[in-house]
Amino acid sequence: MIKQFIARQMVKRTKSRQLPLEILEQKHVDLKEPFPNDSSYFYGGDKEGNAFITRMAFRGPDRTHEYWFDFKFKDLGFFGLHEDPGAEGKGFQQGNLKWEPVEIGKIWRITYEGKVTGEDGKEHTCETNLLFTGEHEVYDFAKSSDQRLIADAIASSKWNRSFFFNLKDTHQVHYEQTGSLTGYIVLDGIRHEIKMWGSRDHSFGSRNWTTWDRHYWITGKSDAGYSWTVTTIRFDFLGRLTAGFVVEPDGTVDAVVDCTDLESVSKNKLLPDNAVIELKMRSGKTHTMEFFRKGHFPYIMDHKYLMFEAIGNYKFDQVEGLGMVEFGFHSDKYSL
């Protein structure tokens, strides 16, 4: 009982923080954290099978920064940035890869000019100018995580110095937003217009990829006007944690408090091509979605954690939709 009470107080203190939007949207690399990390991500996709993804993570002077910049054109294949884009700049910038806020909390510009590599290993020239436009306010995951379930997971764990050191990874600030991605990509002098559904996230705090066991992260939008994000993560020092939200067509936001577990989603295949996930909401509602993976962008984090960002089609409460399907696994523990 004492552990349970202490755990609930710990979670309550962590989840009570609220930062102004103009502060949230800045880069935060706190060198006092065990594993400093500021990570942001943009994704876009359309029903024709075109997709775009970019991510930057700034991790302090002692760890290598992370970068993703990849896209798929349905008739041309996959292209991506395979070499370091350059030194960290002011704000969200690594070399020629740059993101700039146009309107805080709503609109961001993504630009890149340089080389990308195709599936055949050949280099191509690329110029990118995209705008992400949010459809609703940013959603802080501190509002959606079920504090009772988190406290239960903490209380049931063995408490020692190592546990509390690793627990700092769960104290990140993390928010997301769905919307649209528009603009153009010029590939080898040919301009391709981009008009996609989009999603973005931003998190900062401490992150040590080697303590992650496995996870999935699902985000998308249905033709009926629902958009959603749900994630469930299992660490090697802590049980499964779940968070997420559903934005209804009228703009009402409902928090995800539980979802189908990792083992059930992957019962037939560790990296499933499709599966059904049930969402339990704070309002008492439930939603059912089925995803279908259509190719993916692979990444490896800190040489240990495998990430697969898949182009996704959905049925959300039986209505068609599209989005992104992310699965991750610790390479020492799982073999695909």
Predicted features along the sequence, with ranges:
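Structured soluble/peripheral alpha/beta segments that form catalytic or ligand/cofactor-binding pockets
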Residues: 1-336
